[in-house]
């Protein structure tokens, strides 16, 4: 087996010395978060550990097939754990209320691939060169020699596939295809995953798409595309925030667009922004960092206080500056 970072051995030893474990993930979980949380939880349960899996928010409907028993649950106060493992969360703040509910623990392990990770654990395995946290969990299970069952393979394939944009994003490396191939060979149901994740969505999402195509805006010689989502928009669509994952890709795909942005109003004076870049010269992680957020060079976000139009002006100005600097 190829050499691996020593931190992995320390993580495996920490897990082996723990009996009670809580696996947690970031708020508004995406496919990488859901797949990583579930895949690791299932593997640890197979090893005889007493494991719970917590997330502040419900998982998006399209990932329900991965969790038919409802393993991922809302956090509960007053619990104590030998070990807490955070997956795909760049900071403790990204854990939301879960972070406060897991304060009574002996060890915090942080496994993530975000460039902006704050190294908030006692043991931190952060590899920004990996396109997904799911790939890190796969490596962990392989090195620990913990069995990868068909169900775990489904979870990890979903994690890897979704965070690489179905293996289309520039972060995808040759090794990613090898990981995906091994997961399929271990039983990942490719047809089922593709049908559930990519080939079907609820009517409420179709209504949101209609809203987006009717209201998106282009600026800066059509290099910037953006749209707003307000609570009233979600209510009219019969939708909620769980239906918003991936909506930004529809405006990102417009040919002249270099940077796409979604403004989602969470409260009257709190806006969540999501940024996507198609150019290696425009690092949206750096843009998001200006507003207290972070992520990856090609995909990042932040939560920004302030009046909506003020937030929009500041963010669009920062994007324009980045585009102008890129030439």
Residue ranges of model-derived segments:
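Short alpha-helices
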Residues: 111-179
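Conserved beta-strand scaffold positions in the cores of enzyme catalytic domains, especially
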Residues: 108-110, 124-125, 224-226, 262
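Structural recognition of alpha->loop->beta junctions
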Residues: 65-71, 129, 142
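Glycine-rich, phosphate-binding/catalytic loops in enzymes
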Residues: 40-41, 101-104, 126-127, 178
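Solvent-exposed alpha-helices and their adjacent loops that cap or buttress functional pockets
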Residues: 15, 76-79, 100-103, 117-118, ...
